[in-house]
Every structure is written in C-alpha cells, then in structure tokens.
C-alpha cells in the first residue's frame, strides 16, 4: 500500500511550503468545485474561496529519491519528454500523453519543478 501524503500551494503568498495536512484539517474539506470548497457543519453547508491548492503524493520517487506529487514537472532522461503529473480517470498520469505513470520507470524520471513555481518549464 502506498503512503498517503499531501503538499499545499498557497496562492496568495505563492508558497509551496505549506503543511497540507494542517490545511486539510483546518478547512475540513468535503469537496471541491472550481475555486470554491464546500464545507459542512452541524449548522448547515456553506462555501468559501479556497486559497490553497492541495497536491497528492503519487507513491513514487524520482531518480534522485525525491517524492513525486501531482503538479510536479518531470523530465524523462531517455526521451527528453518534459510534462506534468496529473490525476485522471482514477490514476496518476503524464498530462500530454495521457499515459499512466506505470509506463515510465521512476529511475528514468527527474522532478525538475512544479506547475506553480516553474510554469515556464512547460
């Protein structure tokens, strides 16, 4: 079974060092719709703008031993492919190709950035 971990990007401060588990606990996220998160309490449901983007660890490490998260930008050392990791159709995959990450060997992949701090890499 893979380890479940998250990281969070704080939009207003452009900071990736946010403790995602604390964000999740503090905000009690139920589900996401656009840029609003819907919460539930005993008094009823309400929504609010959410200032964090939460990304999940995919359970793999790159060739340097760095954890890979959705939103990371990967480079394949053999094909020179550069693309981002996304979650689609119940699996983590490479965005443009749509190929599941199982088609790539993690020892050939390197995290070179992420979509928030390094969008120019795409």
Positions of predicted regions on the chain:
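Secondary-structure transition motif
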Residues: 1-122
């Amino acid at each position: 079974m893979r380890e479940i971990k998250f990281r969070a990007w704080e939009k207003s401060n452009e900071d990736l060092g946010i403790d995602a588990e604390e964000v999740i606990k503090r905000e009690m996220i139920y589900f996401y719709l656009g840029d609003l998160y819907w919460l539930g309490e005993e008094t009823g449901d309400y929504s609010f703008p959410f200032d964090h983007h939460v990304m999940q660890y995919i359970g793999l490490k790159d060739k340097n031993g760095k954890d890979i998260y959705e939103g990371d930008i990967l480079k394949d050392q053999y094909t020179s492919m550069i693309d981002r990791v996304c979650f689609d159709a119940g699996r983590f995959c490479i965005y443009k190709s749509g190929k599941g990450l199982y088609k790539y060997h993690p020892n050939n992949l390197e995290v070179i950035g992420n979509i928030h701090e390094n969008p120019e890499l795409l």
